[in-house]
Amino acid sequence: MNNHLILGVETSCDETSVAIVSEEGEVCFHEIFTQDHSKYNGVYPEFASREHLKILPQILRRAVQAHDLEKLTAIACTVGPGLVGSLIVGVMMARGLAFSLKKPVFGVNHLEGHLLAVRLVEKINFPFVCLVISGGHSQLIDARGIGDYVLLGETLDDAFGEAFDKLATMLGFTYPGGKTVEKLAIKGDSERFRLPAAMINQSGCNFSLSGIKTALKKIITSLPQITEKDKADICASFQACVARIMVNKLEQAVKICGHSRIVLAGGVGSNRYIRETLEEFAKNHNLSLHFPEGILCTDNAAMIAWAAIERLKAGCTELSLEPQPRLCW
């Protein structure tokens, strides 16, 4: 089949998204609804599922009104990893739509969607090292080709995005707090508080952030009355520490693989300080750094539709449609 046109559905966590993407990289329709879980101080799975049930039909209806779905090649949906209830909603609605249109439906690995999102806007070649950093995942992957990935390392506890949100909660900010931490860090002194950069003296590409979380709790409770200056300095110190960990593990990954290209993917990859730190690392090591802009960093359906197009073109369509909350490479 040529000139693929795919409708993608993304419901792995707390974003409800639908997109229609062409093989040429044109995003014909794209809508993302971000749920409000602030009163829970984190993603509440049951609420997420109910919101997907309510919102997804509305977005699909708008997609139908905006585009002739008879022209679609197929439907694609995230099958994992993610929250099981949220995944079930997306998979069942994608299957129902595909049945009504008499179109095939394909499952997509959410992490592969993040990894390939950059190729929707920039035709970079394989192989490359991909650092996926989001609220639920932190991994280093040797990407050798479509469907050919090797996990080099991952977090042993908290994901980077999760750590940002937990710090925000400790400081009294609403969930999600990653952007608040980033904004405050701009005004802070990154050298005021020394935080443990766990595992940077160990070989391999695994991360650990639990020690940083414990250290942050001690710092915050030791301050008699925390000021805005204290908060800014804590955020800046934390951000500098996690960026240092990323650089260290990325350097080890590049040495293992020997690739000259790096891809930064996932929502935390939109953090300006982290991007600038990794850009400096890449420049100093004669490497090229690539990342998608804007909403393509976050959970979105355009990356799911694009991953399906890439897999169709490569002849890799074997992924099961069963929701797989712990799906890995």
From Swiss-Prot:
<keyword id="KW-0808">Transferase</keyword>
<feature type="binding site">
    <location>
        <position position="178"/>
    </location>
    <ligand>
        <name>substrate</name>
    </ligand>
</feature>
<dbReference type="InterPro" id="IPR000905">
    <property type="entry name" value="Gcp-like_dom"/>
</dbReference>
<keyword id="KW-0963">Cytoplasm</keyword>
<feature type="binding site">
    <location>
        <position position="299"/>
    </location>
    <ligand>
        <name>Fe cation</name>
    </ligand>
</feature>
<dbReference type="GO" id="GO:0005506">
    <property type="term" value="F:iron ion binding"/>
</dbReference>
<dbReference type="GO" id="GO:0005737">
    <property type="term" value="C:cytoplasm"/>
</dbReference>
<protein>
    <recommendedName>
        <fullName>tRNA N6-adenosine threonylcarbamoyltransferase</fullName>
        <ecNumber>2.3.1.234</ecNumber>
    </recommendedName>
</protein>
<dbReference type="InterPro" id="IPR043129">
    <property type="entry name" value="ATPase_NBD"/>
</dbReference>
<feature type="binding site">
    <location>
        <position position="271"/>
    </location>
    <ligand>
        <name>substrate</name>
    </ligand>
</feature>
<dbReference type="GO" id="GO:0061711">
    <property type="term" value="F:N(6)-L-threonylcarbamoyladenine synthase activity"/>
</dbReference>
<dbReference type="InterPro" id="IPR017861">
    <property type="entry name" value="KAE1/TsaD"/>
</dbReference>
<keyword id="KW-0408">Iron</keyword>
<feature type="binding site">
    <location>
        <position position="110"/>
    </location>
    <ligand>
        <name>Fe cation</name>
    </ligand>
</feature>
<dbReference type="InterPro" id="IPR017860">
    <property type="entry name" value="Peptidase_M22_CS"/>
</dbReference>
<comment type="similarity">
    <text>Belongs to the KAE1 / TsaD family.</text>
</comment>
<dbReference type="InterPro" id="IPR022450">
    <property type="entry name" value="TsaD"/>
</dbReference>
<dbReference type="GO" id="GO:0002949">
    <property type="term" value="P:tRNA threonylcarbamoyladenosine modification"/>
</dbReference>
<comment type="function">
    <text>Required for the formation of a threonylcarbamoyl group on adenosine at position 37 (t(6)A37) in tRNAs that read codons beginning with adenine. Is involved in the transfer of the threonylcarbamoyl moiety of threonylcarbamoyl-AMP (TC-AMP) to the N6 group of A37, together with TsaE and TsaB. TsaD likely plays a direct catalytic role in this reaction.</text>
</comment>
<feature type="binding site">
    <location>
        <begin position="132"/>
        <end position="136"/>
    </location>
    <ligand>
        <name>substrate</name>
    </ligand>
</feature>
<feature type="binding site">
    <location>
        <position position="114"/>
    </location>
    <ligand>
        <name>Fe cation</name>
    </ligand>
</feature>
<keyword id="KW-0012">Acyltransferase</keyword>
<keyword id="KW-0819">tRNA processing</keyword>
<dbReference type="Pfam" id="PF00814">
    <property type="entry name" value="TsaD"/>
</dbReference>
<feature type="binding site">
    <location>
        <position position="165"/>
    </location>
    <ligand>
        <name>substrate</name>
    </ligand>
</feature>
<keyword id="KW-0479">Metal-binding</keyword>
